[in-house]
Each structure stands twice: as C-alpha cells, then as structure tokens.
Design a protein with these regions (language model features):
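Catalytic-domain carbohydrate-binding cleft regions of carbohydrate-active enzymes
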Residues: 1-147, 152, 160
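Short, intrinsically disordered, charge-balanced linker/junction segments flanking boundaries
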Residues: 160-167
C-alpha cells in the first residue's frame, strides 16, 4: 500500500498471488488503521500530485521516475534501483525487506544536498548511503531541502468537498 500511495494511481501492491484479498478492511484493526493512515497521506498530497502530474503532461517527464533521470552522472542513481523520484521534490525508498522486531531495514542513497526524512522530521545530509529503520506505519520518503509541497491538511475527507468520511 505504501508503494501505491506514492505512485500515479493508488492501488494496493502486496502479493504475487492474484486471488489474495488486499483491501484495507480485511486486515486486523491495527493494520487497517495503518493502511487508513497511508491513504490519508495520499489524500493530503493530492495538491502536490496534481501539480507534478500537470508538469508531467507539459514536459513529458514521468511523475515517477528512476533516480538516474535526475542524477545521471552519479553511480548510486543506477545502483539503488528501488528508489525513485515522485515528482521533483519527493524521493521514495520503498521498504522491501521483511520486518524484524517491528522494523524493516532500508538502505537509502541520498543525493547531494540536504533531505528531510518524512517519518522522523530529521534533516539528513546527502551524498551518502544510510541504513534506516522503519515501523509499519512509517514511510521511507525524503523531501528535498527548500522544497515547497502543496498539501491538504488531515481534515480533508474527500476531494469532492462533501463532509463524508471515506476511510
């Protein structure tokens, strides 16, 4: 679900078994709450996503793109194939390892410059590879320093302006 939240179309991506149900409401309350949080984060980011989608339309450069599109001269941009840019200012380093003791390990390459780790709010110096640990309800995404991300707040329930809870 985390990958789906940071891609052009939100959908769950969780298994190679086609018949396995992946809807948020089929999981335990704890996991369902985490999935709702991921979906809310996606809704909060809709202004940014729309802005970057419009730019993709105008430039032909994909909303989701491999790191080497933005950093073609840097070897790590080719080595860290799971990482990608989500628009111009958000870098996603998906958690793909199994969890141990409630956390998953993610090796992250940060390009030159400063980056903000969304989950912790920490400022991290780029130009290095870091090993980070994330709980199930944390997202391994990084924001370029100086970026302005247009976002909704948590009170937005849907994009039609009605006050109906959707998640």
């Amino acid at each position: 679900m985390q990958f789906g939240a940071f891609s052009p179309i939100l959908r769950s991506h969780s298994t190679k078994i086609a018949g396995l149900t992946k809807e948020p409401w089929v999981f335990s309350n704890e996991v369902s709450d985490i999935l709702r949080g991921i979906i809310r984060q996606r809704y909060n980011m809709v202004p940014y996503i729309y802005t970057m989608a419009r730019e993709a339309y105008e430039t032909g450069l994909s909303l989701c793109r491999p790191m080497y599109y933005d950093y073609p001269e840097t070897q790590e941009a080719y080595d860290y194939r799971n990482q990608y840019m989500f628009g111009n200012d958000v870098m996603v380093a998906p958690a793909t390892s199994p969890m141990k003791d409630g956390y998953t390990e993610v090796k992250v390459w940060l390009p030159e410059g400063q980056w903000y780790e969304f989950a912790s709010g920490k400022t991290l110096q780029g130009g290095q590879v870091l090993t980070r640990y994330f709980a199930l309800d944390e997202y391994p995404i990084y924001i370029k320093a100086g970026a302005v991300l247009p976002m909704y707040n948590d009170k937005v329930m849907n994009l039609n302006g009605k006050d109906e809870t959707i998640v």
